[in-house]
Amino acid sequence: MTHEWGSAPEFVGPRHELREKLLLDLFRSGSPGPHVLNAGAGTGSFSLRLAENGFDVTSVDASSAAVEVLRRRVPGEVAQADVTTLPFADAAFDAAVLGEVLEHVEDDRGALEEVARVLRPGGVLAVSVPADPKRFGPSDRWAGHVRRYSRQELLSACQAGGFTVERCRAWGFPFAALYHRYLYERRLDRHGASAPRRWERPALAVLSAILQVDRLFVGVERGALGYLLLATRD
C-alpha cells in the first residue's frame, strides 16, 4: 500500500501500523468528543480507525490525489485544504488529529493556531511527529519533511499554538527503530514506496507482530523514532 504526502507516496508497513495504534490509544485516553478533524489525512488509514471507533470524522488533505482516494475510501466529510487555512467555522470540532503532519509544514505554529481555531475550548488534540533533529536525513527529504522535533521544540510549538500539553511520549524503541534503520530505509533506497511484493507480505505480518512489543517501551527516549502528544485547546 501507499499513501500520499503532497506528491510523494509513503510505504505503509509495520512502523506505520504501530504508530497509528499508539496514537489512537493516546487520543482515546483524552476522552474526546464525537466530532473529529483529521487534518493531513493522507489516504485515510487513521480516518478509518477513528470511524471504526465510533467517531464522526472529517478528513482534510492538501493533495488532490489523496482527497480523491479519501472520498472513495472513508466515511464522513472530506475537504481539500492546507492545514494553515482550514475551511471550517470557529469551534467546529470536539477534537483533532495531526498524525505525521507538522514536520511537513513550514509554518507549524500557524498550523497549530488554525487547528486551535476550529476546536472548541477544551477540545482534544493528538499529534505524532518524527523525533531527533540530528537524525534528519535522506528519508526525511524524500518524504517532504522540513524538520524533525526535539521534545522541547514540539512542546513549545503546541503551547505557542494555543494548547496545554497533557502528555508527550517517545515511541519506537527498540524494534521499530531497528526496523526503520535496517529495513525501511534500505527498502526505500531500492524500491521507493512501491507496494509490498507478494513474497514480502508474510514477513511484514511477522514484523508487525514483533513491533507490538514496543508498546512496553513507550516513553523510552533512547533511539525513539517519534513523539506522541496529547493536548487540550486553551
Predicted regions mapped to residue ranges:
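Conserved N-terminal segment of class I S-adenosyl-L-methionine
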Residues: 1-89, 95-99, 112, 151, ...
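Conserved S-adenosyl-L-methionine
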Residues: 163-174
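Short aromatic-enriched loop/helix-cap "lid" or pocket-rim segments at secondary-structure transitions
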Residues: 137-141, 177-183
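A short His-aromatic
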Residues: 100-104
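Feature marks short, surface-exposed loop/turn motifs that line or immediately flank catalytic pockets
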Residues: 133-135, 172-175
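A short glycine-rich, Lys/Arg-flanked "PGG" loop and its adjoining helix->strand segment in the class I
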Residues: 109-124
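Short, glycine-/aromatic-enriched active-site segment of Class I SAM-dependent methyltransferases
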Residues: 125-147, 151-156
